[in-house]
UniProtKB/Swiss-Prot annotation:
Assigned EC number: 6.1.1.5
Organism (species): Lawsonia intracellularis (strain PHE/MN1-00)
Gene encoding the protein: ileS
The protein's name: Isoleucine--tRNA ligase
Quaternary assembly: Monomer.
UniProt keyword RNA-binding, yes or no: no
Parts forming coiled coils: none
Gene Ontology molecular functions: aminoacyl-tRNA deacylase activity; ATP binding; isoleucine-tRNA ligase activity; tRNA binding; zinc ion binding
Catalysed transformations (reactions): tRNA(Ile) + L-isoleucine + ATP = L-isoleucyl-tRNA(Ile) + AMP + diphosphate
SUPFAM superfamilies: Anticodon-binding domain of a subclass of class I aminoacyl-tRNA synthetases (SSF47323), Nucleotidylyl transferase (SSF52374), ValRS/IleRS/LeuRS editing domain (SSF50677)
Keywords: Aminoacyl-tRNA synthetase, ATP-binding, Cytoplasm, Ligase, Metal-binding, Nucleotide-binding, Protein biosynthesis, Zinc
Amino acid sequence: MTDYKETLNLPNTTFPMKANLVQREPEIILWWEENAVYEKMLEASGAKGIFILHDGPPYANGHIHLGTALNKILKDIVIKSRNMQGYRSCYVPGWDCHGLPIELKVEQELGKKKQEMPLSLIRNRCREYAEKFLDIQREEFKRLGVFGSWDHPYQTMDPIYESVITLELARFVEKGSVIRSKKPIYWCYSCETALAEAEVEYADHTSSAIFVRFPIHDKRLHTIFPQADLTTTSIVIWTTTPWTLPSNMAIALNADFDYALLQYKNEYIIIASELVDICLKQFNWEDAKVIKVVQGKDLEGMKARHPLYDQESMIVLGDHVTLEAGTGCVHTAPGHGPEDYEVALRYNLDVYSPLDDQGRYLDTVKFFAGLRVDQANPVVIQKLEEFHRIIQKNTIQHSYPHCWRCKSPVIFRATTQWFISMEKNNLREQSLKAIKKNIEWIPSWGEDRIYNMIASRPDWCISRQRIWGVPIVALICESCGEVWNDPSWMKKIAEFFAIHPRGCDYWYEAKLEDIVPVGLKCPHCEGEQWKRESDILDVWFDSGSSFAAVLEERPNLGFPADLYLEGSDQHRGWFHSSLLISIGTRGVPPYHAVLTHGYVVDGDGRKMSKSMGNVTSPQEIISKFGVEILRLWVSSVDYREDVRISNEILQRLVDAYRRIRNTCRYLLGNINDLTLDELVPVKEMESLDQYILDVVATAYTEIQKSYISYDFHTVFHKLHNLCTTDLSAFYLDILKDRLYTSGVRSHKRKSAQTALFYILHMLLRSMAPILSFTAEEVYKYIPDTLKDDNVISVFMLPFFETSSFLLDDRVRSYWETLLLIRAEVNQAIEPMRKKGEIGHSLDTHITLYVAPELHTLLLELNTDLCSLFIVSQLDIMPLSEASVDAAVSKIDGLAVAVNRAQGNKCQRCWMYKELGSNHQYPTLCPRCTEVVENMKI
């Protein structure tokens, strides 16, 4: 028997079936770099304008983790998709290089040597440390397949950048928004520095909780409570921070609450009326009784006695007093709480905070000198018990602020700090207005989150008592301690930062006479001796100034950005500081839209932690699966919530990837002999080919819309469904006969190849932002006869216009009906297959019994129904002539009869036909005979 395999047009491509991603990806990255593909992509785009995504700088410390990989890949998808849609979209990566984590690492490395080293040398070691990890992270990000200006990133420690930071501060000073005062702020006594709200995280903590008597000897007591005994009456407070009691200055009540005088045996106490029952139960006072009730405002100004010292504690009023816990009488230490501080300002109380930077009581503190606050609680409680001041004590577990870096509990401590006022120049009001009116928040709940944060936040403490950062450019009078920071002078200092090889190191290295203006006298005391301010700026001011240092300075960028894209924790971080600085200095927000993603958790939804042993690194995934699978994972999840990852999840994505890759390989294999001048005009293509182009073009359009709306998981599902359902399971399955057995130059085959060519281009453009390595690899294997010599990369392809592929609604509706008929035919065939009467649908003869309207539809579509249904023989008969064995269909006006095909099976196409019309080819059908004969010519 003759073998006709050589006469078939079988797929032919050298595109490898096995991806070999781990080995192949680095080769592609090297090729991208050698051929400047990122730059060429930018050159090829821009017809529709520009799109600006501004990179939030990761911290230059340690290796990247899955969270940073998720973030960078999301940004890369945005950048590539926008460029391929015709928008020039540059990606300038950045790094946050100053701050405590780096300084602490350097301190660990230096050990005791740090004490003997000059500040400039320590700063230089910090810079080297940041540079080291910047280089490490840069290579790790490039390994993710992320395009960008990797040779020209922005760094917050660049001299120009440090200069801009100082200029932004000068703008605030110019507007009168910067104040220096003694206020209680978050203080980490382990790190010995002030903290911003963004540097504080909450965790469960066990605290001592005590009810404390403050004796009242004020003679006014008898005027309000005639029954009270001045020798045994107290007002009772409840506190979970006993260590702050040495700093007590007052007791706060709510003016509108009722307060009761209670008698228990020979003792009298004052607490809020609504809390009497709860408190008595906690005190185990069964026989106590209410003597009299008055309002809080009636007690204002009365003097109590401090429970530890021979001093007074005034009764004051405050709206912050609630009835949620305690006694309704609030211990007030203005040096250790923002609400206490506000009350102190109204009543002219001393803002007393007798602690050093390490959280130890000063030598002037009686009983507790030298004790650290975390050691002080039991000692304070013991002393209170000695004085019989405690009614009841226990412990509670509650959410308590901790340092983001060292994880230690933090305290409020009043120190002299620099602040940006939230009220001056209406910074708070303008920011809240912009949040509501000028910015799109994705997802929408981000709006309420940042709005509430800014609505309730205190003034921004911008000073830090550390070394590694941008100095606060100000002079301090040696005589009176007042500061001088004229904005014009600050701007001149900033100019020196810009030209100094190590930027703001100029502040520390320059001679004092080169910094202090000649003849400068203190406006307050006329002193002429000055010293430099030693505090540095909050690193959130550094990164928050990036719009000024990057967007307003770099070519191809601009202000404001179209998009900021970071993790949801940045509502209190970079989004927050950037907004305040931009509103404060420009009057407008720095971004049009803010997109946030969640955290990466394990397959069970648990937070990843080393202690749980469930941490997965990007490097592990890349070395096992290749980064393409990691990128596919990013696109497959709804990243706006926390996203799960596990080996099982990744394995499923490997399978999905394989299907997409195999689809591309099949398309490549079947256009290997096609040339551009052989492309068939769409209107002249076979009906089925026109239909599939409509299907793919519609999906392609939806995918592009999903890229624009950042719905990348929709892109993944549409792309995967297109490859598996619309193409592999439907169109490509039908097409095999026409592609393999038709004449090599026949219209039918060229029509099919034309469709495959266009489909491949739509697939490539759909997948390239996500599956960048595979798309590039596929593009390289497209025959040169089908490519523009000047377009060397898939990322240089122009935007693909699909309008000519779209069918009108009537034809599309006809096809939808025809596919329903196809499904009915397949269902009717299945019983014969199960019985073993046939092995393949080609073994069947189908009779369609149709009503007139269906008959008209079938004729109008003018398609080969045998090919569409993958059967050998098909007849169309009037429904009225339906045989008794015809299966009734779910479609009105249709019945289907299935029989074995008549005749013999063609050796070449496997369809049942009358064979041997040409005696030279006794086993071929007439169609195959003609094709084989023509091959001789």
